[in-house]
């Protein structure tokens, strides 16, 4: 377990009533004690301002935002990208309403273009609907404005795609208007990824 990223934007409009049960988490990263069975436990990085950097692949830096965060006027992913994140991941529970899938696709694609990043969006799906909300499992992988992979709704489909991290880093370097300007402190958390020869599904 590398870190815990809390939800900071709690919707309380339309069909959402999350403020009845939850309060927003903190952005600033800190160490929190997470107990385990018996007397064991460990300190875990907790907060939204966490940047997970790969030791073996320079340029691969991952940050997370949760669900509603990508829909707000100033998403956390903006700060993540300016702090150096090249891949944004989002665990979401976005319900299905008329036309919302098209809006969702446009939103994720647009955010990946604006931030010159890869954006991996995983949505609630099979077995998670209730009498109040229906979740279609609409998953999306986007890169710099291009939808690389997208699941069909109401299926248990696994999607995958290759993200060209070197291209993203190069594109950011080329754009004189894309400057890293971190307004709040981030905690870097290193992780390891084994390099393996992989057959690609796209030209990179």
How would you label these PLM feature ranges?
Residues 1-204:
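Enzyme catalytic cores with a strong preference for nitrogen-chemistry domains
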């Amino acid at each position: 377990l590398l870190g815990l990223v809390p939800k900071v934007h709690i919707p309380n409009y339309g069909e959402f009533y999350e403020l009845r049960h939850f309060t927003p988490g903190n952005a600033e990263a800190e160490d929190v004690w997470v107990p385990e069975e018996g007397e064991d436990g460990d300190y875990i990085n907790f907060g939204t301002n966490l940047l997970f950097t790969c030791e073996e692949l320079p340029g691969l830096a991952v940050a997370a935002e949760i669900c509603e965060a990508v829909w707000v006027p100033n998403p956390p992913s903006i700060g993540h990208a300016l702090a150096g994140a090249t891949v944004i991941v989002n665990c979401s529970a976005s319900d299905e309403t008329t036309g919302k899938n098209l809006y969702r696709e446009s939103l994720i694609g647009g955010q990946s273009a604006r931030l010159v990043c890869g954006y991996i969006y995983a949505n609630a799906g099979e077995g998670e609907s209730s009498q109040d909300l229906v979740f279609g499992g609409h998953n999306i992988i986007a890169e710099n404005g291009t939808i690389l992979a997208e699941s069909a709704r109401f299926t248990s489909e696994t999607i995958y795609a290759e993200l060209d991290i070197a291209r993203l880093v190069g594109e950011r370097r080329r754009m004189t208007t894309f400057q890293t300007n971190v307004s709040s402190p981030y905690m870097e958390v290193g992780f390891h990824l084994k390099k393996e020869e992989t057959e690609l599904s796209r030209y990179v």
